Regions:
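Catalytic domains of cell-wall/extracellular-matrix polysaccharide-remodeling enzymes
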Residues: 158, 162-178
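Active-site rim/loop-helix segments in enzyme catalytic domains that contact anionic ligands
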Residues: 15-19, 27-148, 175-176
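Proline-aspartate-enriched helix->loop->beta-strand connector
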Residues: 145, 149-159
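Short, Lys/Arg-enriched N-terminal segments with co-localized hydrophobic residues
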Residues: 1-11
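Short His-Asn-centered micro-motif
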Residues: 66-70, 156, 165
Length: 179
C-alpha cells in the first residue's frame, strides 16, 4: 500500500531533519574533541635552563623576531635576518623534526640563533587558535623579552599579513608581553 502524496512529503521532511540533526551532533562532537585535545595539548614552557641557554647564545644579539611557524622568519623577515643578528622565536612546530631542521639550517645561513616552542599548529586537522594556550604564550614571550633590553622586536603585523589566524595571534601576545 502506497503512502498518499502529502504524507510521503512529510515523511521525507522528517527524515531530512533527522539526518541534519545527526550531522549537527557529529560536528559538535568533533569540535568538542578538538577543544578537549587542545586543552590537554602538552606544552613545555620556557624554563630557567632554556633562559640560561638563550642568555649564552644571544651574547651580542640585540634583535628579537617572534614568528608563528618555521619559514615565517625567512618569508616575512628575511631582510632583517641578513642585516642584523637576531634571536628568532618560533611558536609552533616544535614537534616536527624536519621543519625544525630546516628552521635551524636557515638561521645558520644567516648567522642567527633560533628556538622553536611547541605550541600546536593544527589539532585534528584544524588550525589551532591557541584558545587554551594564549596565557602560556604571553608568559613564555615575557620571559624571552625580559632576557635583555632588545633594540628591535619584530613580529607579524596585526592583520597577520594575509589574515592568517596564527600570525594575528602571534602579533597580539608579542605586543602584550612587550608592553
Amino acid at each position: 500500500q502506497k503512502t498518499p502524496g502529502p504524507q510521503r512529503g512529510t515523511d521525507m521532511k522528517k527524515k531530512i531533519l533527522i539526518l541534519i540533526s545527526i550531522l549537527i551532533i557529529l560536528i559538535q562532537i568533533y569540535l568538542l574533541s578538538v577543544l578537549a585535545i587542545s586543552a590537554l595539548y602538552p606544552i613545555s614552557h620556557i624554563n630557567e635552563e632554556d633562559l640560561s641557554y638563550l642568555r649564552q647564545k644571544t651574547k651580542g644579539i640585540n634583535h628579537l623576531m617572534i614568528v608563528a611557524h618555521p619559514d615565517d622568519e625567512s618569508i616575512w623577515g628575511g631582510a632583517h635576518l641578513l642585516e642584523e643578528d637576531y634571536l628568532v622565536v618560533c611558536l609552533t612546530n616544535g614537534s616536527c623534526q624536519a621543519r625544525e631542521q630546516e628552521f635551524q639550517a636557515a638561521l645558520e645561513q644567516t648567522g642567527d640563533v633560533g628556538i622553536i616552542l611547541n605550541y600546536p599548529d593544527k589539532i585534528l586537522g584544524l588550525r589551532s587558535g591557541w584558545r587554551f594556550q594564549r596565557k602560556s604564550v604571553i608568559q613564555d614571550l615575557e620571559k624571552i623579552l625580559s632576557l635583555k633590553q632588545w633594540d628591535t622586536v619584530a613580529t607579524h603585523n596585526q592583520d597577520g599579513e594575509y589574515g592568517h589566524i596564527q600570525h594575528r595571534l602571534t602579533h597580539s601576545p608579542a605586543l602584550r608581553a612587550f608592553d
